[in-house]
């Protein structure tokens, strides 16, 4: 029989296989024909008629119609991501030994093993760093020689804005952004994805709720449809936030990436847990969480901004997508806590973007120059609502062309 397979990214291909074979045999054939990197057997989930196919069951048992298709969903293995923080800590050892003899030489050598530790290897905090490295020597010792060879190209972006390094830096940031947003869909792609998932037998309302709870991540949305939306995310999937709340927090989004850029290097070296855990304590991240929960379509723009200001953070997000989405899905603090966090974000934004806050977290007023007001008016003249225009304009760092492109890509046929 010939099985038609379709990915959530709209890729379609066919596999010839005996119906007596098991589902696992089909997965192995997909891996052999499409590549182990893109379709590993362990990461494949095959879905037909709204059900996940069991590995040990024969294909004929599912009565697959050759005119229909089987959805193939690939999840990334978690073993790859868990090794990253270990190698990052381990590779700090050679940089700290260099510091003790010559601080000047450390500046040239430290970035090569690990960009995350380069800013903190020169100050007097090298002793704790070396202690951390020596506490976990054995597991990653074999991989240490390979890591320095892979990362030097990204290091100049973090440590030096020299013009000669702009080309590799831009390309690396672009690749990181593509990795971080590869699983997300917006605009017309969103509508196509809704239709695609509905063809699996689900109602439109169910699909939209699942996509909302997963921040438009189609892989996760299908999992929610199959397994059920977790209880802590159901209210977020069903309840639509008031438009005022969206426009209230969004102008502070540039401060989110800027604050993260100034804190990431020092925090990741001292954190003993997950590389992204330090974000929980950042008021700016709490505001970002509120913004994204209210308007998930802004996530790609915010990731792009983070990629420009802090490629290292974007790399961590790309390597730990599931954990990052989980953190974004966590409930936002109550009104009192939000008010305090809003004040901190407003202060940070006031220095760089001219954002001023009025009241106790209920309304934020934005100070704009006449030129910025004209740009906002021009975007409104394209036919977009003022609230969405302000969101896009500030999320795109006041870049009028980028904001216009962002707005044109969005789907405004929602509630």
UniProtKB/Swiss-Prot annotation:
Residues 274-317 form the STI1 domain. Residues 80-175, 334-355 are annotated as: Disordered. Its main location: nucleus. GO terms for cellular component: cytoplasm; cytosol; nucleoplasm; nucleus; proteasome complex; XPC complex. It is found in: Nucleus; Cytoplasm. Keywords: Cytoplasm, DNA damage, DNA repair, Nucleus, Phosphoprotein, Proteasome, Repeat, Ubl conjugation pathway. Residues 84-143 have a biased composition (Low complexity). GO terms for biological process: cellular response to interleukin-7; DNA damage response; embryonic organ development; nucleotide-excision repair; proteasome-mediated ubiquitin-dependent protein catabolic process; regulation of proteasomal ubiquitin-dependent protein catabolic process; spermatogenesis. The modification Phosphothreonine is found at residues 155, 186. The keyword Mitochondrion does not apply. InterPro entries: Rad23, RAD23A/B_UBA1, STI1_HS-bd, UBA, UBA-like_sf, Ubiquitin-like_dom, Ubiquitin-like_domsf, XPC-bd. The modification Phosphotyrosine is found at residue 202. Gene3D superfamilies: DNA helicase RuvA subunit, C-terminal domain, Phosphatidylinositol 3-kinase Catalytic Subunit, Chain A, domain 1, XPC-binding domain. The modification Phosphoserine is found at residues 160, 174, 199. One of its GO terms (molecular function) is ubiquitin binding. It comes from the Eukaryota. Residues 1-79 form the Ubiquitin-like domain. SMART domains: STI1, UBA, UBQ. Residues 188-228, 370-410 form the UBA domain. Component of the XPC complex composed of XPC, RAD23B and CETN2. Interacts with NGLY1 and PSMC1. Interacts with ATXN3. Interacts with AMFR. Interacts with VCP; the interaction is indirect and mediated by NGLY1. Multiubiquitin chain receptor involved in modulation of proteasomal degradation. Binds to polyubiquitin chains. Proposed to be capable to bind simultaneously to the 26S proteasome and to polyubiquitinated substrates and to deliver ubiquitinated proteins to the proteasome. May play a role in endoplasmic reticulum-associated degradation (ERAD) of misfolded glycoproteins by association with PNGase and delivering deglycosylated proteins to the proteasome. PANTHER family: UV EXCISION REPAIR PROTEIN RAD23, UV EXCISION REPAIR PROTEIN RAD23 HOMOLOG B. Belongs to the RAD23 family. This is UV excision repair protein RAD23 homolog B. It comes from Rattus norvegicus (Rat). The lineage of its organism: Eukaryota, Metazoa, Chordata, Craniata, Vertebrata. The gene is Rad23b.
